[in-house]
Amino acid sequence: MNKGLLIEGSTFVLGDDVNTDINCSNKYLPGKDVAYVAQHAFEQLSPGIASRIAHHGGGILVAGEHFGINSSREQATHVLRQMKVRAIVAQSFGRQFFRNAINNGLPVFECDTSAIGEGQSLELDLARGVLCCQGRVLQKSHPLPSEILAILSMGGLIPFLQKYPDWNFA
């Protein structure tokens, strides 16, 4: 399996309408490094989530509808990477956040998340479009387009373009 296309981890569940201001608050951004901002991510929604994810050595965020709505703040994905978030599974994403996540090598997967609970074992196979929870298949969907899978397998758009400078996305 290619790097970044098969992801496993414990789940950390958030709700609906998780906007980028909640995971990357303006209150902490000015002049602060990403590690500092990551310590305060989601604190008004799920206090201590950053330390819980760190305690597990990383994890998978699970959300409902509209994850990453509001701003196109690219730092939001940097904060999630700093927190060792391996992927985000949500019912829907803000489109700008979705693209920022892909461009920064952070896997995102849209599916019904209603059956996924906190602390469960999740396995996500992006190449096949399969999501397993606690060892059973929860979701089969269309895999992400090959161009997106290629970007994710390289760790983001910049590493991808450095390796393939003449790539045509047409």
Question: Model features per residue range: what roles?
Answer:
Residues 1-26, 159-170:
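N-terminal, positively charged, Ser/Thr/Ala/Gly-biased leader segments
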Residues 18, 68-74, 152-162:
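Conserved phosphate/anionic-ligand binding catalytic regions in large, soluble enzymes, centered on
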Residues 24-128:
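Feature captures the catalytic cores and cofactor-binding loops of soluble hydro-lyases/lyases
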Residues 102-170:
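Acidic, glycine-rich flexible loop/linker segments
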